[in-house]
A protein has these predicted regions:
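A mid-sequence interfacial segment
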Residues: 90-125
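Basic/polar N-terminal segments that are highly enriched at the extreme N-terminus
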Residues: 1-5
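Helix-adjacent hinge/juxtasegments
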Residues: 62-102
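A non-catalytic, amphipathic alpha-helix used as a structural packing/dimerization or gating element
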Residues: 6-17, 81-85, 89
Length: 157
């Protein structure tokens, strides 16, 4: 059985590979509207960080997530700082999780408008898969640009 914290660590490791690849692109290529879910490579990357930030607020009953818009991130340094802030929050939360904490229940309204009971583990798995889905989108866009995406397989498989 995989510990959800291992999935979080994996996502962080792979996220850095993608950040490094995106950092090599000219800014106009990074921000170009490619008619994808959040239009540009930059926006998709920011969205995945925003999802982590949002769900950490939910799990921790905080209101610390950024209110910045995509265009407020004008440099790779801006992206790196946001990524670092979100990752510190996630690492701190994950390190504090006890076996009981992973099973803590919350009520959330799902995308169908239905109130649903979920555990912290459910939320963390959702955060993991949300980023993986959008990583697939980044892969497709990089391929369309003729760029080989970074390795992303679990344990380099």
């Amino acid at each position: 059985m995989v510990d959800v914290r291992k999935l979080i660590e994996y996502n962080e490791e792979v996220r850095h590979r993608y950040f490094d690849s995106l950092a090599k692109l000219p800014w106009d290529e990074l921000t170009k509207n490619r008619e994808a879910s959040f239009h540009s490579l930059r926006n998709i990357f920011i969205h995945t960080l925003g999802a982590v930030d949002y769900w950490l607020d939910f799990l921790l009953n905080e209101k610390l997530r950024t209110k910045r818009e995509f265009d407020d991130y004008g440099t790779m340094d801006d992206l790196q700082k946001y990524m670092a802030r979100v990752e510190v929050r996630m690492r701190t939360y994950a390190a504090s999780l006890t076996p009981e904490g992973v099973l803590k229940e919350y009520e959330v309204t799902n995308d169908l408008g239905v109130a649903t009971r979920v555990t912290a583990e459910d939320v963390l798995i959702h955060v993991f898969e949300e980023e993986v889905h959008h990583r697939g989108e980044l892969i497709a866009l990089l391929w369309q640009m003729g760029i080989e995406p970074p390795l992303m397989g679990w344990k380099y498989l």
